[in-house]
Amino acid sequence: PHAPFNAPKKYWDLYDRASLPPLNPARPSGAPDLAFHDSRELLGLPPDRVEFTAEQVAEIRHGYFANISYLDAQLGKLLDALKRSGRLDNTIILFVGDHGYHLGEHQLWAKNSNFELDARVPLLIAPPECRQAGGRTASLVELIDLFPTLVDLCALPEPPGLEGVSLVPVLGDTAQSVKTAAFTQAPRPAYFDREPGGQPTAMGVSVRTAELRSTQWRDWASGQVLARELYDHQQQPEELVNRIDDPQWARARMQAETLLEAQFPRPSLGAK
């Protein structure tokens, strides 16, 4: 959900504000400035920019949880209506978010980063007679996989040129994985379309594997890499330390950056 977090009171009452999961607002150690943005979606811009008090942060986070429960209730109404219509057993249900959200973590608010909290989204797929009902999977997924999945579930011919892959194998066996990497991008400035010139100055391209997240920040005009990030998702999924200069991660970094170069080719500059 987006701000304003204005769910009805009964959804706020589901949560004890003091018992919500703790917030770690620290920036990841060693992360470049390009990894961050001005959080204007919630904080605004000068001269009207604000800084939240601790009480306001707690209220906003409480409101986010309330909005999620409100959203869940609306989804329940939709499913009840499908059941009453007699169409539930002939309907593919797919619930997805278009981006994640920061609530003060990493000193960020709202979206527009390549961190996991923005890149990871909820995804529920419930075809009729799903054999893995209620199952969860660690399989990497991209939103470009949704259309091929629906085509597959409907037994339709797959159009040529699709970038995504069907997730049907995962629906049959949640231990399966259909891809080894998922990619995201985030521009800088985050709202470049509202800046003079209407173009970004840099683009962050990121790859997530089962083990790590690797991000390159590239000059928009030349493609030259301006900054790099590498986060260990096995031991620290919160992305709190940039491991880019850690020699123990040198091989993994090289492999991840090979994936990035293949997915997001750069001009031949000679510069790395």
Annotate each predicted stretch with a short phrase.
Residues 4-10, 14, 81-142, 191-192, ...:
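Histidine-centered active-site microenvironments of extracellular/periplasmic hydrolases
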Residues 2, 15, 52, 121-124, ...:
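A short aromatic-rich beta-strand->coil structural motif
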Residues 32-33, 58-70, 87, 113-121, ...:
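A short beta-strand-to-alpha-helix junction
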Residues 64-71, 75-78, 92-97, 123-125, ...:
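Beta-strand elements within well-structured catalytic alpha/beta cores of enzymes
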Residues 56-60, 106, 127-134, 237, ...:
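Flexible glycine/proline-enriched surface loops and loop-helix/loop-strand junctions
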Residues 41-59, 67, 71, 190, ...:
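Long, internal low-complexity/basic segments
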Residues 4-52:
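Core domains of carbohydrate- and sulfate-ester-processing enzymes
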Residues 99-105, 131, 144-147, 152-233, ...:
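C-terminal cap/loop subdomain of S1 sulfatases and analogous C-terminal strand-loop tails that border
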